[in-house]
Amino acid sequence: MMKSYEIDFKEIFGSNYEYKFFSPGRINLIGEHIDYNGGHVLPIAINLGIYALVSKRRDKSFAFFSDNYFEMGIIKTNNFDYAKNDGFANYPKAVIRSMLDSGISFPFGLNIYFYSTISEQAGLSSGACIEVLTATVLNEIYKLNLTSFELAMRCHKAQSEYLQLNSGIMDQCAISLARENNALFLDNYMLNYEYIPYDLGDYSIVVCQTNKPSQKVNSKYKQRVRECQRALDIIKNNFNVLTLTKIPKEYLEMIENLLPDNKLYRRVLHVVTEEERVLKSYEALKEHDIDTFALQINASHESLRDNYDVSSSELNKIVELARNEQGCIAARMTGAGFGGCALALVHNDFLVEFKENMAKKYFDETGIHGAFFEVSACGGPRRLPKDTESLSDAIASLVQYAIDSHLIEEEDRIYTTNRILAYLNLDYIDEGTSHPEPLYMILDTIINYAANMGIIENTPEAKDAFDATIMNVFVPRPSAIIREFYSISEKSSTKALEYLYNISLSSNYI
């Protein structure tokens, strides 16, 4: 059963939380390892990420707690320099330090409880996610009025200067600037960006998580950065180029003769060709040309594996298995590599079969339980309503939907509201405001609350069952439905069938 983070917060910090925030993770569709080489990238923010529950403190200290690092307990500090023993807390500390060094002051401290729906080892940018989340918390609570781009830049400074992680700006921008149902076409050299509609037609992106993280990813990443810089320094002595991604493809043969070894040339070869693949993907997505996009994805993996040497045996195996599955037209590793995850482009008709087959075959081949899930392009970091506020509105909206759909009468409003509260283990809730949202969105709020509070298990099966339980509040007993059906059928069998269809549709049964 899922724990109640709301209850945990009170037990850990001794008070109720006042604010709730969310920041998405990100996945890069294409453009790997060229952000720090001044290239273009095509990331999306995804519908998984990190949440923060926050309350104000009476002193100026900041206290951090992460459900992912429960054993570390509360990390309370007013010293925001890097400290190895502070672990995950160095990410929010670095953001705070970056803000302080820019002249921003914080008149009071905060208690911040982090919990995540993404694995740190998945390669979905959990570090940048917690940075942007922290910056969003500070921006909102202290009313700093910083733009999304400014937040991204401050987070990148925190990561590069205070955490000494030399990377491009992609991760922070992909998260902070995210727009729902759009990909971000980002120029890492000019710092320009453009939104393009994320519409894959009959296809979806499935994340294929190897669950085999590398213990040396940071050192290997830094080595690639150094190799690229060394190659660029040599090339600059002979060609007027500013970054590796600006090298024309026709120069590659001449450049191969300039570089002292084949390894450096292969690094340059990947960077130059990956930039070309991003530009082709950009045009393909705008034209809804999925086949061309798929070709770029596949070629990207080959280059990352053979030229940039950042793949792994598990990544190669998961990509190989994915490409052999019916409905999958492309797959590649994504992220820094050396472990982490891949992405697959899969036809919607084969999603269930794909995930089931991949889970079995990957385990059979590696002995590792992988994880396979679809992702969609979501919006950026934001403040969320407190659980009870959004819940009361959802209940009010659901009851109003039932009245409008003629499932219940106006006189049944209080009775049905109380029945729903009983299923949620609540005796009372403040009266909410109904909103004309789609039924699935209303139900999602109620069902996710039940999972969050440990009322139901956080599984698709348990959520589906609870969906049916809630909607049954509005449905007459089977005996009453049968009587009504036979009564109508005496006049018209067609109308009797319409009655069954309409009540099934309105009650979310079909």
What does each of the following model-derived ranges do?
Residues 1-26, 30, 51-90, 100, ...:
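C-terminal nucleotide
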Residues 17, 35-40, 77-85, 116-124, ...:
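A short glycine/serine-rich beta->alpha loop
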Residues 38-45, 224-225:
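Short Gly/aromatic-enriched secondary-structure transition segments
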Residues 45-47, 124-144, 343-346:
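DPxDG-like acidic metal-binding loop motif
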Residues 96-119:
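Glycine- and acidic-rich phosphate- and metal-coordinating loops
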Residues 101-109, 138-154, 347-361, 365-366:
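Phosphate-handling active-site elements
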Residues 145-193, 331-334:
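Alpha/beta catalytic cores of group-transfer enzymes, especially the acyltransferase/condensing modules
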